[in-house]
């Protein structure tokens, strides 16, 4: 009876680690670079907005975080489009830059039509919902949650679109960590004062952003507030929130040091 020689793996002679490694992707210069990301890298946190009696107010901080590093602290996350609309964004900032370019092209094309009408806030909101849903179906979503607000023809508009194209309209909109912290505060204030004026709405937004600064590790106390109302649309300059005065504990520290 003949015995066939069988080669069994011998410890130390087989590189199991090398065999388990995935095949490395080969660079193809004809494919070009990837333009959009599947992983958020430089991100912004919450955007919050509420309707008041004659318009809409929206607020956000100006911090962009590189992972957990507070990297860029003076960046606008709200942009004007046309004469009636402001869009605020949380999430990946490079994707928001791509969306900004797309909307600027849309507004330019609409202006070139010269038909006497301008894009409304609701039309821009619907367009963004289709764009984000299309990118999601391609498996390459734009990693943003967008808040669209505007005022036209005596009517206020406030809507939201997320990274998979889900969209809805409401009187109060929040994104990010603000959906957990700021949303209950905004709802309570609106229930107590359903016809708040502009100054009350601005103060409410500032108070909510102050709470988010205390509770959200990705936020800052440098903020911007946008208004869409009878006098048009406006984005404020940087506002520094007055926060808790930590020197109030100096007396306790001095007493403790004497013990």
UniProtKB/Swiss-Prot annotation:
<dbReference type="InterPro" id="IPR029055">
    <property type="entry name" value="Ntn_hydrolases_N"/>
</dbReference>
<dbReference type="GO" id="GO:0043161">
    <property type="term" value="P:proteasome-mediated ubiquitin-dependent protein catabolic process"/>
</dbReference>
<dbReference type="InterPro" id="IPR016050">
    <property type="entry name" value="Proteasome_bsu_CS"/>
</dbReference>
<dbReference type="Pfam" id="PF00227">
    <property type="entry name" value="Proteasome"/>
</dbReference>
<comment type="subunit">
    <text>The 26S proteasome consists of a 20S proteasome core and two 19S regulatory subunits. The 20S proteasome core is composed of 28 subunits that are arranged in four stacked rings, resulting in a barrel-shaped structure. The two end rings are each formed by seven alpha subunits, and the two central rings are each formed by seven beta subunits. The catalytic chamber with the active sites is on the inside of the barrel.</text>
</comment>
<keyword id="KW-0539">Nucleus</keyword>
<protein>
    <recommendedName>
        <fullName>Proteasome subunit beta type-4</fullName>
    </recommendedName>
</protein>
<comment type="similarity">
    <text>Belongs to the peptidase T1B family.</text>
</comment>
<keyword id="KW-0647">Proteasome</keyword>
<comment type="function">
    <text>Non-catalytic component of the proteasome, a multicatalytic proteinase complex which is characterized by its ability to cleave peptides with Arg, Phe, Tyr, Leu, and Glu adjacent to the leaving group at neutral or slightly basic pH. The proteasome has an ATP-dependent proteolytic activity.</text>
</comment>
<dbReference type="GO" id="GO:0005829">
    <property type="term" value="C:cytosol"/>
</dbReference>
<dbReference type="InterPro" id="IPR001353">
    <property type="entry name" value="Proteasome_sua/b"/>
</dbReference>
<dbReference type="GO" id="GO:0019774">
    <property type="term" value="C:proteasome core complex, beta-subunit complex"/>
</dbReference>
<dbReference type="GO" id="GO:0010498">
    <property type="term" value="P:proteasomal protein catabolic process"/>
</dbReference>
<dbReference type="GO" id="GO:0005634">
    <property type="term" value="C:nucleus"/>
</dbReference>
<keyword id="KW-0963">Cytoplasm</keyword>
<dbReference type="GO" id="GO:0005737">
    <property type="term" value="C:cytoplasm"/>
</dbReference>
<dbReference type="InterPro" id="IPR023333">
    <property type="entry name" value="Proteasome_suB-type"/>
</dbReference>
<dbReference type="InterPro" id="IPR016295">
    <property type="entry name" value="Proteasome_beta4"/>
</dbReference>
